[in-house]
Amino acid sequence: MAKELKFSEDARAKMKAGVDKLADTVKTTIGPKGRNVVLEQSYGAPTITNDGVTIAKAIELEDHFENMGAKLVAEVASKTNDIAGDGTTTATVLTQAIVGEGLKNVTAGANPVGIRTGIEKATAAAVAKLHEMSHTVNTKDEIAQIASISAANEEVGELIAEAMDKVGNDGVITIEESKGIETTLDVVEGMQFDRGYMSQYMVTDNDKMEANLDNPYILITDKKIGNIQDILPVLQSVVEQGRALLIIADDITGEALPTLVLNKMRGTFNVVAVKAPGFGDRRKAQLEDIAILTGGTVITEDLGLNLKDVTIDQLGQASKINITKDNTTIVEGSGDKGAVASRVDTIKQQIAETTSDFDREKLQERLAKLAGGVAVINVGAATETELKERKYRIEDALNATRAAVEEGFVAGGGTALVNVIAAVSALSEEGDVQTGINTVIKALESPVRQIAENAGLEGSVIVNKLKEQKEGFGYNAATDEWVDMIAAGIVDPTKVTRSALQNAASVSALLLTTEAVVAEEPKDDAPAAMPQGGMPGMM
């Protein structure tokens, strides 16, 4: 296949055009007075959202070179979302600002490699200052404030704070779609462990790439399954019951996994396989925890049990299981409550007796999984479109809150990024390296500028006035007031702000140092096919 090439300014200009098209779409959503974007779906109602990464992933540009620029920004948003769970719009705005300012200097003759060095130095100084300004999350009210800002909804903030209060900051919180219009919180007994599905073909929800099993059986073993014949009897028993099956095993090798996948895709049975959590003795203990929680038996040679002889009575059961590529969450296991309570007491005793900090930490993790439960936020709305939009907001708010618990929080509304400018300006370098530093200094103003413009104000006026304020004071676009941002509860997680800046700087530096771009040549439309019909001379 022939390729099309562009070099130097031509290449960078085309990619910048793509960056601008995507960023101009995404940045309209930033701030309390940001707008929504409507995304067409291949089927069903359109999606209305203000979630940066969702918008970025939906954009495909016709021009191959512009599309590459757009995809680089989408990667910034996606990476920020993966690390911090929020801040995708901020990352996009920062990327556009760094690329725009950087390319002006490259076009004027600056050395892109020098600019990249300056960008990296400035980013490191900004991140160090962000950590210095960061406040730790100590109270339920602070958690509620952070969640409320991210979701732009106080009620949601209170709900997330309540959920984290009930299951702990590291507890499992899932977000479900409700059949009603109210958004509610339920805490159910459950357990999560860090193993996901063995094959992506086992998913039941292709949009989220996750598998959901309702009222499934659970086969728990520390053995490797290499031959499908080993588990065929129990598979047949499960199929006869018309139920789904989760297999937790040391590994599934040979022809066993492809056979399970093939039968799943054909609809013969609904099965998901995951690897057993932990290693060595800890693995055995965790499998026993799962067995007690679900009312099953661990199929292990230690007990003289064989896979071929497994009966349906030895399988665990649960109300619901959610499996992603990284985690498995078991909700409402059918185990005996007395047995679970006894297991919890045993683990507590082991925690009291152990002298190893590492062992104590692992035991506390097991205790939290057995006793902590799972908080479920049931999202309600009047329409399907509103439901999706609200669910996106709550997911972002939960991610932002977890990030704040992890690394603390700073003044929100882009204020912290302007506050770090003084620390970055203190850097003194020569030539193009200093130009790179100045590029980041100007870009740090861009989120506040855009928040102000979305509120119908002149961005430059707000930025200049903000620079005159003492650290932590900023502009509240929701009320059109200048306030102490932290006292007013307008805060951003440090991790979100840091990740947005680091990812934006990283990809922008790569784009600025691009000298050639290679793309597929546009394909001519194929001629229309002749209509189907019989052979000449046939009736």
Swiss-Prot record:
This protein's UniProt keywords: ATP-binding, Chaperone, Cytoplasm, Isomerase, Nucleotide-binding
Residues binding ATP: 29-32, 86-90, 413, 476-478, 492
Entry-linked Gene3D superfamilies: GroEL, GroEL-like equatorial domain, TCP-1-like chaperonin intermediate domain
Protein location: Cytoplasm
GO cellular component: cytoplasm
Pfam entry (one): Cpn60_TCP1
Gene Ontology molecular function, alphabetical: ATP binding; ATP-dependent protein folding chaperone; isomerase activity; unfolded protein binding
Subunit structure: Forms a cylinder of 14 subunits composed of two heptameric rings stacked back-to-back. Interacts with the co-chaperonin GroES.
Name assigned to this protein: Chaperonin GroEL
